[in-house]
Amino acid sequence: MKKLLSLPPNLVECFHDVEKVERSEWFCTSDPVGSKLGSGGGTAWLLDACRKEWSPEASLHEWLPREKRILLHAGGQSRRLPGYAPSGKVLTPVPVFRWARGQRLSQNLLSLQLPLYEQIMEKAPDSLHILIASGDV
């Protein structure tokens, strides 16, 4: 299942190294510099950028139903947590909860969100191909 992330511009090139994830499974881009696309425009931008990089020969209509994808909007201004705006909200560290299983000291918001999103998509009907989520919820 592919993961598509909209990130702050400075994080796009280094995200795979920081999180130690495969480029073939994770696509990252940012909104055009100086533009405020909003969630709808950002979703369209992210999907089209991913299609152009991974399957430039296919139309968007052909490409969308090929596989399931999790799309996370993780950029933005982060007005509530400005200290995490440069690194992206999904990389915000989350403290370990006492007595909780499966937690690790290096956990961040993304590592806590992703298992649920993957479970949702695995149980979703085959006709549903994209889960769109906000990276800070």
Regions of interest found by a model, annotated:
Residues 1-137:
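Unchanged
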